[in-house]
C-alpha cells in the first residue's frame, strides 16, 4: 500500500489516478498531506471529472488531466469538434490545442495538463499555452462549449 511506502520513507508523496470524490477524500484521510496529485481524464469532450477538479482545488491537490486534448486520435480534430475552441484560437492566431491547454490551466491553479506528443512542433505548441491568457468571456464561452 502507498501508506506503507510513505511510512517506510521509500516515497515522499503519493498520487492517485481515475478517482472519484469519495476516493479522493478517503485517500486524503489515509495519506494526509502526503496525497499531492490526482490524475483523471479531462478535456473539452470529457468533463465528467469536473467534481474531482473542484475538490482538488478545494484541497490544494494537483489535478493532472490525462488526455487533455481528447486523446491522440482526437487531438487533431479538436477545433472542428469544438467550434468555440477553434474560434478563440483564430482570434489569438494559435492552435485549438493551445487554447484547450490554456483553458484547462485557467480552470484552477492546481491544474497541470499532461499532453502527450511525439513531434517537436506540437511539444512547442503545448508549452506556449502557459503564455496564452484568455479573457474571462472566452473562458465562459469555452466552459459552455460541449457542456
Feature locations, PLM:
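Beta/alpha (TIM)-barrel catalytic core signal, keyed to glycine-rich beta->alpha loops juxtaposed to Asp/Glu
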Residues: 1-147
Amino acid at each position: 500500500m502507498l501508506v506503507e511506502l510513505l511510512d517506510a520513507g521509500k516515497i515522499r508523496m503519493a498520487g492517485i489516478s481515475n478517482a472519484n470524490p469519495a476516493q479522493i477524500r478517503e485517500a486524503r484521510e489515509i495519506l494526509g498531506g502526503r496525497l499531492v496529485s490526482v490524475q483523471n481524464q479531462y478535456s473539452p469532450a470529457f468533463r465528467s471529472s469536473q467534481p474531482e477538479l473542484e475538490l482538488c482545488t478545494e484541497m490544494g491537490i494537483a489535478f493532472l488531466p490525462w488526455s487533455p486534448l481528447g486523446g491522440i486520435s482526437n487531438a487533431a480534430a479538436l477545433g472542428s469538434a469544438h467550434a468555440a475552441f477553434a474560434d478563440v484560437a483564430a482570434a489569438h492566431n494559435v492552435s485549438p490545442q493551445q487554447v484547450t491547454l490554456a483553458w484547462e490551466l485557467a480552470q484552477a491553479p492546481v491544474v497541470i495538463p499532461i499532453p502527450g506528443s511525439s513531434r517537436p512542433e506540437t511539444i512547442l505548441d503545448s508549452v506556449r499555452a502557459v503564455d496564452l491568457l484568455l479573457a474571462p468571456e472566452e473562458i465562459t464561452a469555452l466552459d459552455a462549449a460541449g457542456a
